[in-house]
Amino acid sequence: MSEMSLIMLAAGNSTRFNTKVKKQFLRLGNDPLWLYATKNLSSFYPFKKIVVTSSNITYMKKFTKNYEFIEGGDTRAESLKKALELIDSEFVMVSDVARVLVSKNLFDRLIENLDKADCITPALKVADTTLFDNEALQREKIKLIQTPQISKTKLLKKALDQNLEFTDDSTAIAAMGGKIWFVEGEENARKLTFKEDLKKLNLPTPSFEIFTGNGFDVHEFGENRPLLLAGVQIHPTMGLKAHSDGDVLAHSLTDAILGAAGLGDIGELYPDTDMKFKNANSMELLKQAYDKVREIGFELINIDICVMAQSPKLKDFKQAMQSNIAHTLDLDEFRINVKATTTEKLGFIGRKEGMAVLSSVNLKYFDWTRL
C-alpha cells in the first residue's frame, strides 16, 4: 500500500454561497461540513497524515485531535502550498471539503490507477450542448474536473513553486509537463458552491441540539458621559467606567453569545489593551461578535437579560432596549426579554456604586434546509 497523506481545503470565504454561515461550517447532524467530508475520505485509507486548511484553527481544533491544521492563504493555491509544507509522503490526495459525498467507488478508482501518471483526477463528461461566445464547443473534448485528486508530492510542490494561480492540482502539474490520468467522476462529487446546490445533494440535516450561554458583566459609575444600555441612552451623565462606551448590557450579551458558541469571551475578542476599541460602540461590537458566531453555523433562538441596578429606574427603557437588540442582531423581538431589578440596597449595587447585567442565550445550528 502506497504511503499517502490527505489535504482537505477548508479555508475559503464562501463568497458565492451568499449566506451568513460559511458553507464549511454547515452542520450535517452534529458535524460541521468540513469534518463530515474529512471523516468520509479518511475512512477509505490509512493516510499517513491528514492536514486541514483553516480560517479558524482554534475553533476547528475543538472537534478532533487526529488532524493537523494550518492557516489558509488568500487563494486555493496559497492554501495548498502552505499545507504541502507539512507533507513528506510519496503521494498526496487533495480535496475540497465542499465535495462532501465522495464515494468509496470513486476513491477506489483513483487508487487503482495510482501508477498511471503524475496526477490522477476524476472528471465528468459533458452531456449538454456547450457554447462559448455563442459558438458550439466539441463537448466530446470537454471534461469537468473534480476532486479528490492524487499527485506525486514532490512534483506538486514543484508545480506550486511557480507561484502561478491554478484552480486545481492537475492543471498545475500539467503546466510542468506532468502526465495526467483521468478516471470517471460522479455526480455526488459535485462541489457545493451555491446555496441552491444544497437541494441537489442528499445531505444529513442539522441536529436539533440547543446550546446555552451565560454572560455576566459589572461596571462602576463614575464617568461624566451618557449611560448606555443596549445602545439606548438611559441618563445623560451617569456613565460607567470602561475602555469602550461602557454599555454593560451589550458586554454581558456578547459574552453569552460567544460562550454558547464556544468562541471564548469578549476580552479575547476585544481586549481593553487595544486602543482601537477605546470608546467603541459596544452594540457594533456585539453585532460583529454575532456575525462570527453565525459564520461557524449557529443562530439565536432567544435572549433573556437581567439588569441589576439600584438607580436609575429602567422600567421606561426596557421596550427600547429590546427593540434595539432585535434590530442589531436581526432577531424577532418576541425572542428577546429584558428584566430589571434592584438588590434591595444591598452591596455595591445597592450603594449605587455600579451596575451589573446577567444575560442568557440559546443557540441552535443554522437550519440550511430553509434556504
Swiss-Prot record:
Needed cofactors: a divalent metal cation
GO molecular function: 2-C-methyl-D-erythritol 2,4-cyclodiphosphate synthase activity; 2-C-methyl-D-erythritol 4-phosphate cytidylyltransferase activity; metal ion binding
Source organism (scientific name): Campylobacter jejuni (strain RM1221)
UniProtKB keywords: Isoprene biosynthesis, Lyase, Metal-binding, Multifunctional enzyme, Nucleotidyltransferase, Transferase
Pathway(s) of this molecule: Isoprenoid biosynthesis; isopentenyl diphosphate biosynthesis via DXP pathway; isopentenyl diphosphate from 1-deoxy-D-xylulose 5-phosphate: step 2/6; Isoprenoid biosynthesis; isopentenyl diphosphate biosynthesis via DXP pathway; isopentenyl diphosphate from 1-deoxy-D-xylulose 5-phosphate: step 4/6
Annotated spans, 2-C-methyl-D-erythritol 4-phosphate cytidylyltransferase: 1-210
CDD domains: CDP-ME_synthetase (cd02516), MECDP_synthase (cd00554)
Binding site residues for 4-CDP-2-C-methyl-D-erythritol 2-phosphate: 217-219, 243-244, 265-267, 270-274, 341-344, 348, 351
Protein name: Bifunctional enzyme IspD/IspF
Catalyzed chemical reaction(s): 2-C-methyl-D-erythritol 4-phosphate + CTP + H(+) = 4-CDP-2-C-methyl-D-erythritol + diphosphate; 4-CDP-2-C-methyl-D-erythritol 2-phosphate = 2-C-methyl-D-erythritol 2,4-cyclic diphosphate + CMP
Entry's EC annotation: 2.7.7.60, 4.6.1.12
Keyword Nucleotidyltransferase: yes
